[in-house]
Amino acid sequence: MTILLTILASLLVFGAVIAVHEFGHFAAAKLSGIQVNEFAIGMGPALWKKIAGGTQYTLRLLPVGGYVAMEGEGSPESNQAERARDGQPEAAAENPIPPDQRTGIPFPEAAIWKRAIVMAAGPLMNFVLGFVVLVLVVATQQEVITSRVIYSIDEGALCGQTGLQAGDEIVAVNGRRCFVTNDILYELARTRDTQADFTVRRDGRLLELPGVRFDTYTGEDGGTRMNIGFTVYALARTPLNVLKESVNSELYYSRIIFTSLIDLLQGRESINNLSGPVGIVSAIGQAASYGLTDVVEMLVLITVNLGVFNLLPIPALDGGRLVFLGVEAVIRRPVSERLQENLTLATFILLFGLMIFATYNDVIRLFTGGL
């Protein structure tokens, strides 16, 4: 039962996140007057297909991928390679739309700003999905909306003895701006010792509180844990507070993804902690065992992760395509297609290698009880 629940939850999460991403590209291309030859959801053999409005809509067997085929996007060889990567049959490389039914212009003939919108629309839709889901969660499932204003400090707590006071509004921790309570907790969790520098608003003035210290306790695993030692005020569940909490929570998710990447590059986090598809599926399965709310929150994390990751300036990603378009706008001619293909292939191989390494980490943790 647990395995079945994990599979169903994973298909739901991955299917929703990828479908929304591809729909963003598709909708932007259509609105920009670009010919979309195929909009496919899923990978593998086609279960259903229909041509309407100059586009073939395809539903494929495995609901864990998607594809938007625009007229003139890349060379025939690169298009065939992309389709192979997305698990689509070689026969699909042929244009399914007869010339007299095509309603748009080829992708390269569209204005640069329109092509940029098409590339950015996929990640943007991931952020939109995350925001909509967060609004629903905050409005209906989240027990309480918390503020950043300290309500009380535990009696004898070190944080109260070293600077914090009831009524303080926490603005930043260790120089990093905090928008929601989770920002505060995240920054404290990243602290290497048991003290942190706070910026608070007290009586209308900003104050710097360096070296605020926290009590510690020993966890069940024998590790040292930080005891926060204070509580914050709750906010009324008004429409405005729900929207603000949803926006700030999405910023929080985006921020921890960026911060995790930076920590990885700076060596603060070991590359051995990198997790791949197996780890993600395992996390979704754990969330499913706790309930629907946890699965939905996992969906938010994954969709925001996909949005942020795809905007990175890496040639194999949407962000890399945006960089190529930016260069084209500056030099007033397209970047060499061969150069684009070579850079895309090189970074795709690198990303694929990282995924294999992360999957290896996941499998090791799975068999050693780390997942």
How should each PLM-predicted stretch be described?
Residues 291-308:
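Small-residue-enriched transmembrane helix starts and helix-helix packing motifs
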Residues 357-371:
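Juxtamembrane boundary at the C-terminal end of a transmembrane helix
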Residues 47-51, 149-153, 326-342, 369:
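Membrane interface segments of multi-pass transport proteins and intramembrane proteases
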Residues 263-267, 303-317:
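Transmembrane alpha-helix interface/packing and boundary motifs in multi-pass membrane proteins
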Residues 40, 65, 240-266, 278-281, ...:
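Membrane-interacting alpha-helical segments
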Residues 5-13, 301, 348-354:
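Alpha-helical transmembrane segments of integral membrane proteins
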Residues 3-95, 312-331:
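Small-residue-rich helix-interface/hinge motifs
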Residues 4, 78-114, 118-121, 125-274, ...:
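PDZ peptide-recognition modules
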